[in-house]
Curated annotation (Swiss-Prot):
Cellular compartments per GO CC: cytosol
InterPro entries assigned to the protein according to its UniProt record, in alphabetical order: KH_dom-like_a/b, RbfA, RbfA_dom_sf, Ribosome-bd_factorA_CS
Family per similarity comment: Belongs to the RbfA family.
Pfam assignment, any one: RBFA
PANTHER family in the record: RIBOSOME-BINDING FACTOR A, CHLOROPLASTIC-RELATED
Subcellular localization, as worded in the UniProt entry: Cytoplasm
Record keyword Repeat present: no
Protein name listed in UniProt: Ribosome-binding factor A
GO biological process assignments: maturation of SSU-rRNA
Length: 119
């Protein structure tokens, strides 16, 4: 039980800190833009690996390029997280694409374009 609470807290801290790095332009790669968001983080039960799911309101190759850039900068990102979060072992990060946000915008656009007729 205690391990699950620790895992959950660490996941939310990682979401917050990685999001702050992206937002404050702590990552200098131009492919990492302000339209990115950390959707969720999933840490393995042994707390060694973490999957970081990245979403964007921009569609297509922009998100793929940003995920590649984040994976290239994961050593730097882990170093920054070590400075900001006091944890014995920081999980190894891997960044993955998450299409939840773009799908939500797409569904919202469809709903807005529906015309309801008064009967």
């Amino acid at each position: 039980m205690e391990k699950e609470i620790r895992k959950s807290k660490l996941e939310s801290l990682l979401v917050q800190e990685i999001g702050n790095l992206i937002l404050t332009k702590g990552i200098k790669d131009p492919r990492v833009h302000e339209f990115l968001t950390v959707v969720r983080v999933e840490i393995s039960n042994d707390l060694i690996n973490a999957k970081v799911f990245i979403g964007s309101i921009k569609e297509g190759a922009s998100l793929d390029n940003a995920v590649k850039a984040l994976n290239n900068a994961k050593g730097f990102i882990q170093g920054e997280i070590v400075k900001r979060i006091r944890v014995r072992n920081t999980p190894k990060l891997s960044f993955l694409r998450d299409d939840t946000i773009s799908k939500a915008f797409y569904v919202n656009k469809i709903i807005e374009n529906l015309s309801f007729s008064d009967e």
